[in-house]
Every structure is written in structure tokens, then in C-alpha cells.
A protein has these predicted regions:
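Catalytic domains of carbohydrate-active enzymes, especially glycoside hydrolases
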Residues: 51-69
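Glycine-rich, proline-tolerant flexible connector loops at the mouths of alpha/beta enzymes
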Residues: 65-84, 138-139
């Protein structure tokens, strides 16, 4: 079939609108910039780091929070320089590290500070300036000892002071099963650390599962937030196990018949959902961010990707575009 020149030119006039619609589900990354967490791909053995970066590029999540530092370099058979190159060629950024080396043992003080320094030196090479600090897990020795909580707060002040000398900020990541998980523990911690030295890097799912008012907590500590996780969740009683779906490879393509979830399942993991599928009030959170003029990263930390990382991050990106960006870009 022949197409007239007039028809061809007319079709060209529609191209910008078509392209705009095609891109409309990709987050704008203006005031709020969106990141993924490397942790998810630990549930997809054999994934190459370049596959992960391609998912980020194609779904509009240009940042990554690194996990398992420094061991992830060996796990993914990549050097720091190679990672820098692969990120740069795709226009992506390493934005922080999930830092799990905080110790309440006074004898470990210097090693703890040295480990924090190493993590921030690594991040500085990528232009990052924030360290996400996890409190010690309750299964670690010494966390229930008298004075342990105070020792943790003291160490965080020291980490925050160190961060300031390196041009960094540091903030606490609340987490179930760790020393800081409930509203009372968060309040106690935030009151004990120096607000000039140490901030808050909240996780919405862990707030929700701990029974917190998510929007209220973000609003309460908004002046101390430099980084946060948007992660959706349902309380266990409201979260029946999802029906088994075909597994998906790291790039979102079908890869067998087993459910695409971590081996062995797990109660906590099954309470985590794509943005908008759970109970967290993200529009409320976003209105707080708008009110404070937040400019920074939000990590959409998927602990499970039932349809595969590519498909689930596309779903999350669509939620960001359709539900959150009308509130605040």
C-alpha cells in the first residue's frame, strides 16, 4: 500500500505525542530521583550486573543502593572501576550503601568507624554523599546488654561526625528485627543522637509493619530526612500468600514454572508488594515531601519481584507517574 506524502507528513506531526505517551510511565526524576536496591537481585542467582543496570535504565530508576559492601564486587565479578564505567555509559548513579557494620561492642569502635569510612570513600568515587546506616540485628551478640542502645547512639554520632568531615550525611534505616524498629525505639534513637550529626533514612514498609503511622513519622522527622525508601506492605493478617505465578528472569522474561520469589518463601517477604498494591499511604508521604521541598533520592526497595525485576519496576514506575508525580515531581 502506498502512502501519500501528505499522509506521511501528517503522521509525523503525531509522533511527538506518541513518543510522549510511550515515555509517560517513566519517572521524571526531577526533585525526587528514583533508585532501586541491589538486594533484590540476590534472589535471582546468576544475574549479571549489566542486566541489573539495563533494568534500571529501561524503567526510569537511575540510581542504585548497593548492598553487601564490599562483597558484592566479588559476587558480581566486577571491579570498582568497571562498575563506574558501566553506570556512566547508561547515565546511572550509585547513590548509597546499605551499611550493616554498626556494632555496639565498645571494643569494635575503631573498626566500626574504619568500616564506615571505607564505605563512604567508595561512594564518594561515584559522587554520592549519603550513608544509610542499619541498626544491629537483634540476633547479634550484645544488643540486649545494659547500655547497648546508648552505645549504638554514641557510635552513630561518631559516624555522623566522620561523615561531615567527608562531605557526607548519615541516617538511620529502621528495620524489623533490629535494634531500632518500633515507633518508641525510633523516637528514643532520634532524641539521643545529635540532629546536627545524624539523620533519618526511613523505610515505609518497615514503619508500617512495626505499627507506625508512616506519614506521621515522616512528617515528624522531615527536617532530618536526606534519603528514604518507598516500599509497600500489608500487615500479615491482611496479606494472604499470593497465588503462584510463572517465575521470571532478572530481565522480566518468563523463566520456568516456579513462583518468582526467594527460595523458601518467608513471612516477611510475602508481606512486601509493588508500590500501590499494599497499604502504605504514599500520596500522604509525598505530600509531606512536597511541603518540605524535598530534593533527593527515594529507593523503591523491592524485596520480592513476583513478575520479575523488569516488570515489577515498570509497574512501580507507572504508579510513580500516575499517583505520585501529580502531587510532587
Amino acid at each position: 500500500m502506498k502512502i501519500s506524502r501528505r499522509s506521511f507528513l501528517a503522521s509525523l506531526s503525531l509522533l511527538p505525542a506518541v513518543l510522549a505517551r510511550a515515555q509517560s510511565q517513566v519517572p521524571a526524576n526531577k526533585n525526587v530521583k528514583w533508585a532501586v536496591s541491589l538486594n533484590l537481585w540476590g534472589y535471582f542467582p546468576g544475574t549479571k550486573i549489566t542486566d541489573i543496570l539495563d533494568v534500571m535504565r529501561d524503567t526510569g530508576f537511575p540510581g542504585i543502593r548497593l548492598t553487601g559492601f564490599p562483597g558484592f564486587l566479588n559476587k558480581y565479578s566486577i571491579t570498582q572501576a568497571q562498575l563506574h564505567t558501566e553506570l556512566s555509559k547508561r547515565g546511572l548513579s550509585a547513590v548509597t550503601i546499605s551499611w550493616n557494620s554498626l556494632s555496639v561492642d565498645p571494643a569494635m569502635r575503631q573498626q566500626t568507624l574504619d568500616n564506615a569510612r571505607d564505605a563512604m570513600k567508595f561512594l564518594a568515587d561515584f559522587g554520592a554523599n549519603h550513608l544509610v546506616v542499619f541498626s544491629p540485628g537483634l540476633n547479634r551478640g550484645g544488643t540486649a546488654a545494659p547500655g547497648a542502645f546508648e552505645e549504638m547512639c554514641k557510635r552513630c554520632n561518631e559516624i555522623g561526625e566522620l561523615a561531615g568531615t567527608m562531605g557526607f550525611t548519615a541516617g538511620l534505616h529502621n528495620h524489623m528485627g533490629q535494634m531500632v524498629q518500633t515507633r518508641e525505639q525510633i523516637d528514643q534513637f532520634m532524641a539521643a543522637v545529635d540532629p546536627k550529626l545524624f539523620g533519618f533514612s526511613p523505610d515505609t514498609a518497615h514503619l508500617h509493619l512495626a505499627g507506625c503511622d508512616v506519614v506521621g513519622m515522616i512528617d515528624k522527622y522531615k527536617s532530618r530526612i536526606k534519603f528514604l525508601d518507598y516500599k509497600d506492605a500489608k500487615l500479615p493478617a491482611a496479606a494472604p500468600a499470593p497465588a503462584a505465578a510463572p517465575a521470571a528472569a532478572a530481565n522480566g522474561t518468563a523463566a520456568g514454572t516456579a513462583a518468582a520469589r526467594p527460595a523458601g518463601g518467608g513471612g516477611f517477604i510475602q508481606n512486601i508488594y509493588d508500590l500501590g498494591d499494599g497499604e502504605v499511604d504514599f500520596p500522604g508521604c509525598h505530600r509531606v515531601l512536597k511541603g518540605m521541598g524535598y530534593k533527593g533520592w527515594i529507593c523503591v526497595d523491592l524485596d520480592i519481584a513476583r513478575l520479575g525485576p523488569m516488570a515489577d519496576y515498570k509497574r512501580c514506575g507507572a504508579y510513580v507517574v500516575n499517583k505520585l508525580e501529580p502531587i510532587y515531581l
